[in-house]
Each structure stands twice: as structure tokens, then as C-alpha cells.
UniProtKB/Swiss-Prot annotation:
SMART domains (UniProt xref): AAA
GO MF entry, a single one: serine-type peptidase activity
Stretches assigned to coiled coil: none
Region of interest (Disordered), residue spans: 481-501
Family (UniProt): Belongs to the peptidase S16 family.
Segments traversing the membrane: none
Keywords: ATP-binding, Hydrolase, Nucleotide-binding, Protease, Serine protease
UniProt-recorded name of the protein: Putative lon protease homolog
Amino acid sequence: MYVDMNREYLKDINTTEDVKIPEDPLERVIGHEDVMPMIKIAAKQRRHLLLVGPPGIGKSLLAQAISFHLPEPSEEITVVHNPERPERPFVEIKNRKEIEDEILEIERAEGELIDPQSAPDAVAERLGFKCIHCGEYSSAYNSICPRCGGDKFSHIKARRKHIGDLLGMFEMSSGSLSVPQKRVTTTRIIDGVEEVVIYERVGGEEIKVLDQRALEKRRQIVEEKPRNVIVPLDRKTFVQATGASETELLGDVRHDPYGGHPDLGSQPYERVVPGAIHEAHEGVLFIDEIVHIAGLQRFIFSAMQDKTFPIVGRNPQSAGSSVKVDEVPCDFIFVGACNIADLQYILPPLRSRIQGEGYELLLNTTMPDTDENRAKIAQFVAQEIELDGKIPHARAAAVELLIEEARRRARAVDDVDNALTLRLRDLGGVVRMAGDLAVMDGSPYIETRHMEVAIRKAVSVEDQIIRRYKSYEKALEKDLSSSQRMSQHGYSSENIDRSYM
């Protein structure tokens, strides 16, 4: 039996195994109920977001949750060969209906598979399915009829021998004559109109029928311009580009060592690589710590403004440097994240664009210490255990210890009483250490003893230094080796023999 922590409290569970984990990613976010309405609006109305707050409070989880509420992509982006100017390929955008219709047309061009008995008798005989002696149907790979024992291909041999005699030729190999025809072309009348029909043997058991429409479609496919699908229809709606390089973010054109030679090399359209801004088309582009790509913020601003961005070769020494694909779509929801101290380093026009077409949200670092929020911590523990997949569930008493630790950290780090910390990434480390201890102990659940050790041990190196040395300065002093201590006072070099030098 699962307990919904949105309606029940911690006293209703024995272990985190009893906790029901929500399917909606937005309901998995802990402690940000005040900004949740704006997050849902951003998903529905396609608004940009700037999430501000310290690391580990759920910014990336919020961005992923937005993508969960977006509809499936409806457009596919294709780069098409330009025969007049190969270094300027075209962009082709197809919606889902056009692609589905195209797939149906291709399937029609591939023909219809029928049973040999459904084909005309003359066709079935020439393709090797029907015996001309008794009319029995069998595999085209069987030259001897299994019913009458006659040679199914005797008429084919006689016809080929007759043609060979007329042309003054002789048989080089009798074995090759025993193979039936692969394809038979004939005509049929439908609605008073005569049309060409081709029957093709598929293996030894089926026949493919290509009518006039299928043949016409095949011809169109052959004549169609070569293309390269760079953003497929079936794709993820969440693209993370944290710390991306210029090439990863904006796209590139791969180098061709043969310089695009028509015979040896590859055409420019084949070497076009989309950037993260193009892959996020109709989805979410998430960049955490946006100040780390300060030089690329202006490109993101341009892409948000125009909803298109060209793909060019970015290496001047590459054969792709002369290739450019204009107006490649990139209509995405931008979700940026940063710390409070980094706000000053965000490009002002980019922030203006976000404010004009979205929202800037300051996220909480604590939540009130209520029964409902304590139950949310239990939900968080269950989610972390499921996400990890290598540790057992926790007893309710162990969860109570973690809640007490969350209360202590809210006071120590954020100086807030009667609150629980939302710096949940650090708490996740405590849960994993407790789970690892339970695994090593052979315990089916995380017990209080495991959680107590994890709370004591899963602390930062800085806290460990203070705990051991009382101050950071003393730690630095103790960290010096004996030779380093001596070097600070210098060496007496008056009586050193350097004659060997």
C-alpha cells in the first residue's frame, strides 16, 4: 500500500517503501509551492525563466518538469542540398502531418505484398511459384514440384534456350537457367484505364505488387534532392547546455579532408551539425550557471529574439568554414539559472528579454517546519532511493533523524528557525551514505544507526577541517611538511661544500 504524502503525514508510513512517488515531475519538486504557479504558466504559455538561488535547491529539476508539460514536437528540420550553390544548403521544415503522409507514400512506393495464389496464373508461373504441369503452388526456390515431381521451370529454360539460339549464343551454365524471373511486367485495366503493373518476387514465399502510383512515387523519390535531417521529429523536449562551447551551443559544419570533392568527399549539407539551440526547438533549453558562458549570452539573446539562428562552419581552417545555413528554426523556452552573486554578470539585454517575455524567480532555501513539509522530506528520501537504485529504503525513524538534520541545517546555514532546509542535494548525499552503510551491513532497510553515522560523516571538507583543527589557519600550518617549515626560515649555507658543482 502506498501513502500519498500530499495528503498523509509521516506517522502513516513504516518505511519509505510505503511512499507514493508522483508521476508528474512538478509534484516531485520539494518546497517551492510559492513559485509553482509561475512555473506552470511558463510551460503553458511558453515563457522564459531565470531561476536564481544557491546550488542544490532544485533549479534543474524545475526546468525538466517544464519540459514534461510541453506537447510533443510537431516540426522536423531538414537541410537540403543546393545544387547551384552547395555551400548554401536550404532549410526545409515539415510538420507531423506532412511527415506521416510522406511515410504513407513511401510505403505505397514500396508496394503491396500478396500471396502467390492471389497473383495472375501466368505471373505466378513465371516467378516460379506455380507448377505449369499440375497447378500446385510451392516455394519459388523449389525447382521440382512437390506434388507431381515435374520441373517447374522447364518453360523458362525452353524460352531462354530459344532466345539464345536466335541470338547465336550457347549456354555457359545450365544451373543459372533454373532460377525463375525476379520481376514480371504486365498491364491491367482498372475502371476502364489500362496501367502498368510490376510483380516482384520477395524471397520464396511472397510477391510485391507495384502499381502505377507506386512506380510514380518511386521515380519522385529517386529524383528528390538529397537531404539531411538535423532535428528529427521524435526528440527530447529538454536540452541541457550547461558549460557548452560555441560549437555545441550554436552548431557547426564538419571538416571534409577532401574539400567537398563530389567523388571523394561529402557534400556540405551532409556535414551540417545542429547546436543545442536548434535541438531545443519547440522544447526547453536549460543552462545552469549561465555566467560561465558569458561570451555566448549575446547569441542566446539573438536566437530568443529572432527564433532562428544560422549554422556556419566555425573553424576558419576547416573546409566547412565557407558553408552557411540561414534561418534554422530555434523557437525554444529558455530557462537560465544562476546564484545571487552572479546576477551582475548576466548580459542586460538578455535579462530584459527574459523580463519582457517571461519571469525572474528567486527560489527559497528553506520551508516552514510543518507536518506536511516533514512528510515532503520523506517523499524526497523515497525519490532519492528510487533514483539511486542501489540502496535500500529507510525506516520512518531514520527519516525522522534526517528531518532533524534538515532543521539544524536551516538554522546553521540560512539562520532560519522553525524551518527545514531546501538544500536537498546535500541531504541526498546523506541518504546515499546511509544507504551504502546499510548495504555493507547487510541490512534490508536504512536504520537509525546508519543515518546517525551518515549525518556525522557526510559533511564538507571545510567542516571536517574545523572539527579536527578548530580553525582553517591551524589546518594550513599543520598541513606543511617538515621541509616546508624549514624553508620558511631559510638555510644556513656558509659551511656547504659546493666544489662538486
